A protein has these predicted regions:
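Mid-domain alpha/beta scaffold segments of enzyme catalytic cores
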Residues: 12-14, 22-23, 33, 38-39, ...
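Conserved small/polar residues in nucleotide/adenosyl-binding loops
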Residues: 1, 40-42
Length: 433
């Protein structure tokens, strides 16, 4: 009786979960934190799916490619995970044999752009909580399948710094390709809230000179510049720049930058539906190389009229696109062949208050399973995620929510959006695949 009571107590406190998981899959080697990691060979196990028995390799969701004919992706929950920084009962192990691939089409990872969270500064404060961990951030992204990242810029100075930093990240110390990080690209353009820089004599002597300087950045950095932008209209933050100035220099960038270079557009629109659409409609010829309206939070009618402008226009979806039930219903309606995934890191993260999180219960959160729960900045340590700081690796969470609301698989969403990203930004590049 005493033994029975003890076992019952252990079950209640979940102390037996690792042992039960081990017994349930006696052909799979389960390793706890602190144990030897020398034996890395994956065992084979039989998994029954829909009345059939398949032999497959038990592997982490993010294992590298391996040949397989099975399109199904079974999962095992509550299995002890081997990473030191994750909980003992991290929840997702799967038998998928091909890692999903992503292009994060919008992330603010260059500190010169004013987004300094990856340098350890938060809430626009002067206190530094930790050393720069941006390389760790990029390595995490690569680990979960992010193959390319577009680092956005919003001014002339930012465009220069972004191009320079992307080239640095793309090579290792010996000048060879850096295989540990995603391939980094940048954008060149002026954000609508910064459009006043065209009239700032401390930046350039005239708007025309400013545009010429932007063109020079594109020409001198053709290997890393993938888009014109971030340009457009933002009527939510008119305290930064008035409507007329925004419209004037949005038009100028379309004519001078999109008109000259064979590059797609990276577009921004906030609370500006009518003016944004009318300007694009008048300049439809400049959409010939395609465009993405990033971080979309508009209505179904709004994205439908934008997609109708050109068959190379896409809609970018991130955490801000998944806040409310209405937002999620809109995303549900966006055709997969016209959708791109992004994070807009360190902003636009998926928060627990967002409606979209209903599609990512904690025990199926793949990022949390791999890297552990996020910490407060003051508790940062190397390799840690930070609470409320979005990272490019969180594109997996965005993908999970999109798949959930559309009633399809993450693999299908990732494949479609990755195909779209390459078609838009890298149509002529040979990726050696």
């Amino acid at each position: 009786l005493r033994v029975s009571v003890k076992i019952a107590c252990m079950l209640k406190t979940r102390q037996l979960k690792p042992h039960i998981a081990f017994l349930a899959s006696n052909k799979t080697t389960v390793r706890h934190r602190g144990e030897s990691s020398k034996k890395k060979k994956k065992k084979k196990t039989k998994i029954r799916i829909a009345g059939t028995t398949q032999t497959t390799r038990c592997s982490s969701f993010f294992d590298e490619e391996e040949e397989s004919t099975s399109p199904l992706v079974p999962t095992t929950k509550n299995t002890p995970f081997v990473e030191k920084t994750t909980p003992k009962t991290a929840s997702i192990l799967t038998t998928t044999t091909k890692m999903m691939q992503f292009c994060d089409i919008g992330a603010n990872v260059v500190s010169a752009t004013g987004d300094t969270q990856f340098d350890g500064f938060y809430h626009h404060g002067s206190k530094r909580y930790h050393e720069s961990d941006v390389v760790d951030v990029l390595e995490r992204a690569h680990k979960v399948g992010v193959r390319e990242i577009l680092a956005t810029s919003g001014t002339l100075d930012e465009a220069k710094a972004t191009a320079r930093q992307c080239r640095t990240w793309n090579t290792d110390g010996g000048g060879e390709k850096n295989a540990a990080l995603p391939k980094m690209y940048g954008t060149v353009g002026v954000h609508p809230t910064r459009a006043g820089e065209f009239n700032d004599s401390t930046k350039c002597e005239s708007p025309e000179a400013y545009v010429d300087a932007l063109k020079t950045v594109v020409r001198e950095n053709a290997d890393v510049v993938a888009a014109i932008g971030e340009c457009g209209l933002d009527y939510d933050r008119l305290h930064f720049c008035d409507k007329e100035t925004q419209k004037k220099y949005f038009q100028l960038q379309l004519e001078e930058l999109a008109g000259e270079f064979e590059l797609p557009l990276f577009l921004h629109s906030r609370n500006s539906r009518e003016d944004f659409y009318e300007i694009l409609k008048r300049n439809a010829r400049h959409l010939r190389k395609g465009a993405v309206v990033h971080s979309f939070t508009g209505s179904k009618e709004e994205f439908e009229e934008l997609l109708a402008l050109h068959d190379k226009v896409y809609i970018g979806v991130n955490g801000c696109s998944l806040k409310t039930e209405e937002n999620v219903e809109v995303v549900k309606s966006i055709p997969l062949d016209r959708m791109l995934l992004e994070t807009d890191a360190p902003w636009c993260g998926v928060k627990q208050t967002h409606f979209g999180t209903k599609y990512v219960p904690e025990d199926t959160d793949r990022i949390r399973a791999v890297f552990g729960p996020p910490l407060k900045p003051k508790k940062w340590h190397k390799g840690a995620l930070i609470k409320d700081r979005c990272e490019p690796c969180h594109i997996v969470t965005v993908c999970q929510i999109v798949a959930g609301c559309k009633g399809t698989t993450c693999e299908d969403v990732a494949a479609a959006c990755y195909r779209n990203s390459r078609a838009l930004f890298f149509p002529h590049k040979d990726f050696g695949e």
